[in-house]
Regions:
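Carbohydrate transferase catalytic cores enriched for Leloir-type hexosyltransferases
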Residues: 1-234
Length: 234
């Protein structure tokens, strides 16, 4: 990648964080890098009927209210901190993602702390979009991301978002997501409770999050890409 980036007339990065990483680690000049964000699947932008959501809820035996986490269950996604943060609460956790060896740590913590958790795999894109819409809160305290597409999926699906204050995630989450130190379990616990106990704040942040998500529409990404290509042609 370093050789290709050196030879390229321009380099497209998927976030300002990625741009900084390319400059720092690959020593590519900042002036030849352009940022074009990623979007998400159309399924997350579509509206679902009450009947459709009811079917999804019944199929996966989802609780009436739940905290949602989406992504491969691996160390950098930091799910263990969420499980620890839920200790002593009655807040159900739903996780959609492939299990790795890291899941053993999650199981051990669940057994000790008696956290209510449901783990789902092999979920279709349409079903996943419905699960997002049924969630009370989406949480994504990842330690590092190139961009963080699950955050964008959540913004379009309209649960409020809690995510990390590190890496590129503030770029993806925008002003009205709630941010945590991903290494601070107590901070995560406080932010979860803040939203869980305040439905009005949840609605406000969800509405503002959907407004912010419009910068990640296919149309906007197309315009940004064409701007880069036209720059090369001129």
């Amino acid at each position: 990648f370093k050789k290709a980036a050196e030879m390229a007339d321009l380099v497209i990065a998927i976030s300002e964080q990625t741009k900084r990483d390319i400059v720092e680690f690959l020593k590519i000049p900042e002036e030849k890098i352009r940022v074009v964000y990623q979007g998400c699947h159309q399924a997350f932008k579509e509206k679902y009927t009450e009947e459709q959501l009811k079917e999804i809820k019944q199929k996966f035996s989802l609780p009436d209210r739940f905290l949602l986490n989406v992504g491969t269950i691996e160390e950098r996604k930091n799910l263990l901190s969420v499980v620890k943060a839920l200790q002593g609460t009655d807040i159900p956790l739903v996780v959609v993602g492939k299990k790795t060896k890291y899941f053993q740590k999650i199981e051990q913590e669940l057994a000790v702390n008696k956290v209510k958790a449901l783990f789902l795999e092999n979920v279709s894109m349409q079903e996943l979009a419905g699960i997002y819409r049924l969630a009370e809160i989406f949480i994504y305290p990842s330690l590092f991301e190139g961009f963080g597409i699950p955050v964008i999926e959540a913004l379009f699906s309209e649960p409020p978002v809690i995510t990390s204050n590190t890496s590129c995630l503030p770029e993806a989450g925008g002003e009205h997501s709630l941010y945590v130190n991903p290494l601070d379990v107590e901070d995560i616990r406080v932010k979860i409770k803040q939203l869980w106990d305040n439905p009005e704040e949840c609605r406000f942040r969800a509405e503002k999050g959907l407004d912010f998500a419009q910068k990640f529409t296919d149309e906007q990404i197309f315009r940004d890409l064409m701007k880069v290509y036209n720059e090369l042609r001129s």
